[in-house]
Curated annotation (Swiss-Prot):
The lineage of its organism: Bacteria, Pseudomonadati, Pseudomonadota, Alphaproteobacteria, Rhodospirillales. This is ATP synthase epsilon chain. It is a peripheral membrane protein. Coiled coil: none annotated. It comes from Rhodospirillum rubrum (strain ATCC 11170 / ATH 1.1.1 / DSM 467 / LMG 4362 / NCIMB 8255 / S1). Gene3D superfamilies: F0F1 ATP synthase delta/epsilon subunit, N-terminal (2.60.15.10). Belongs to the ATPase epsilon chain family. GO terms for molecular function: ATP binding; proton-transporting ATP synthase activity, rotational mechanism. The keyword Transport applies. Keywords: ATP synthesis, Cell inner membrane, Cell membrane, CF(1), Hydrogen ion transport, Ion transport, Membrane, Transport. Pfam families: ATP-synt_DE_N. Disulfide bonds: none annotated. It is found in: Cell inner membrane.
Length: 134
């Protein structure tokens, strides 16, 4: 049996899941990185993108995160995600509705802060749609 590391995904509301994995690939701000058992300690910011977990040499789960932070130790990888979506259970219609809502907010925004927030929401929705298709 292959050696595993514990992967935890945490949202602001709750622990989304915790499971043993052979490897997890995280979209770090400076590039994707893989965490495996006995990994050197690492802290990283996480950009919007897809986290992939591996077991048996195959992708087990793909989760889109909207950003956050990751901590890797020799026996654990914890991602604190701003938002997280399991791509296997997310419909394209739901993603398109999210993108449309973000686009509408951007068109209606009046202050610079509203525009920046709406633009970020739209960029995340576009990345989520691309991840859902890919």
């Amino acid at each position: 049996m292959a050696e595993t590391t514990e992967f935890e995904l945490v949202s602001p509301e709750r622990l989304l899941f915790s499971e043993p994995v052979e490897m997890v690939v995280v979209p770090g701000t400076d590039g994707d990185f893989g965490a495996m058992p006995r990994h050197a300690p690492l802290l990283s910011t996480v950009r919007p993108g897809v986290i992939s977990t591996y077991n048996g040499g195959k992708v087990q789960r793909r989760i889109f995160v909207a950003g956050g932070f990751a901590e890797v130790t020799e026996d654990r990888c914890t991602v604190l995600a701003d938002e997280a979506f399991d791509l296997a259970s997310l419909s394209e219609e739901a993603v398109r509705a999210r993108l449309q809502a973000a686009d509408d907010r951007l068109k209606e925004a009046t202050s610079e802060a509203e525009k920046a927030e709406a633009a970020q929401a739209k960029a995340i929705a576009e990345a989520l749609l691309a991840a859902r298709k890919g």
